[in-house]
From Swiss-Prot:
Stated family: Belongs to the glutamate 5-kinase family.
Sequence ranges assigned to domain PUA in this UniProt record: 280-358
EC number: 2.7.2.11
Organism: Leptothrix cholodnii (strain ATCC 51168 / LMG 8142 / SP-6) (Leptothrix discophora (strain SP-6))
GO cellular component, one term: cytosol
Protein name (Swiss-Prot/TrEMBL): Glutamate 5-kinase
Gene name of this polypeptide: proB
């Protein structure tokens, strides 16, 4: 394994439910304490560490006497609310024993989608890291209304890595790493020691494994690595049961699969746009506009738009799609959806005549547009 982890100064560590719970029946305090011992060792090396930890729902289920994961949203939220108390307590106790302060940070997609809240969250986390505190992060499951998670904690880990400009994301799981096929089904499956994050071949290889307690599978980890690569963070997917896995990784030992961020780092504002999971709408563009955006780095003009979908307002992040529906970019809309429909396929010189005013000549300016 390369020196990516050895040289990393700021690391986001994500641990899955199976590594911090007793097979889904409440938290495994001994396991969490072992992780905290390793986190403390990393801090003593001069590194900054953020922990993204699952386990709240499993702990809540135990405290409520539930043996199976509920399906109703309000029951999942109730379990999360109960379990967050225990999760925070265990981490606080274990980190305090190592001489470290801890902070619980609960995030939602809305916190990351709103630019001002995003910047506030970033400022808070960077301040905590500067104080030598270990933030322990989870989705604020109790107040999420559309679904119980951002998607999963793998995705949350990648979003946090981008939020704090981490050098590396470590995803610790109950699997050794990434294989060319599902090793449980294919005896010829080859272990992948190192690859480039974001390559289509990786997504094709990934299976859909997942347990009854957690929600993640290998595909979510592949996509998380792709997302983290946007801000320059490489990702390691490793088996969390390896003894001293974190310490061995930062020593350069070849544990797990390393997915290297090889693409140019995206500017912070554009990374924020790329990280949006829920978009208010989209526009389809003709082939000429597609070439201008993709190959020449131009702005999106109304004349290149052939269809407007959704209900968005000025300043919302929207997707830009090819005529085949493939997302090629996203950016901040200069006009609301109803306005965009009126000016679509029209030259910019006609905007004022059609709307009675003209905010901008572009539907999306190139400074507010990122290719995906």
């Amino acid at each position: 394994m390369s020196d990516v982890l050895k040289n990393a100064r700021r690391i986001v560590v994500k641990v899955g439910s199976s590594l911090v719970t007793n097979e889904g029946r409440g938290l495994d305090a001994e396991a969490i304490n072992a992780w905290c011992v390793q986190l403390a060792a990393l801090v003593r090396q001069g590194r900054e560490v953020v922990m993204v930890s699952s386990g709240a729902i499993a702990e809540g289920m135990k405290r409520l006497g539930w043996s199976t994961r509920p399906k109703e949203l309000h029951e999942l939220q109730a379990a999360a609310a109960v379990g967050q108390m225990g999760l925070a307590q265990v981490y606080e106790t274990s980190l305090r024993e190592q001489g470290l302060g801890s902070a619980q940070v609960l995030l939602t997609h809305a916190d990351l989608a709103d630019r001002e809240r995003y910047l506030n969250a970033r400022s808070t986390l960077l301040t905590l890291l500067g104080l030598g505190v270990v933030p322990v992060i989870n989705e604020n499951d109790t107040v999420v209304t559309d679904e119980i998670k951002v998607g999963d904690n793998d995705t949350l880990g990648a979003l946090v890595a981008n939020l704090v400009d981490a050098d590396a994301l470590v995803i610790l799981t109950d699997q050794r790493g990434l294989y060319s096929a599902d090793p449980r089904k294919d005896p010829n499956a080859q272990f992948i020691h190192e690859a480039e994050a974001g390559t289509p071949e990786l997504e094709q290889m990934a299976g859909g494994a997942g347990s009854s307690i957690g929600k993640g599978g290998m595909i979510t980890k592949i996509l998380a690595a792709k997302r983290a690569a946007g801000s320059g963070a490489s990702t390691v997917i490793a088996w969390g049961r390896e003894k001293d896995a974190l310490l061995r990784l930062v020593d350069g030992e070849a544990i797990g699969t390393l997915l290297i961020a090889s693409t140019p780092k995206v500017a912070a504002r554009k990374q924020w746009m790329a990280d949006h999971l829920q978009l208010k709408g989209s526009v389809r563009v003709d082939d000429g506009a597609l070439l201008k955006l993709r190959d020449e780095g131009k702005s999106l003009l109304p004349i290149g738009v052939v269809e407007v979908q959704g209900d968005f307002v000025r300043g919302d992040v929207i997707a830009v799609r090819s005529q085949k529906g493939i997302e090629i970019a996203r950016g901040l809309a200069n006009y609301a959806a109803n306005e965009a429909r009126l000016i679509a396929r029209k030259p910019s010189s006609q905007i004022e005549g059609l709307l009675g005013y003209a905010n901008e000549a572009e539907l999306i300016h190139r400074d507010n547009l990122v290719l995906v």
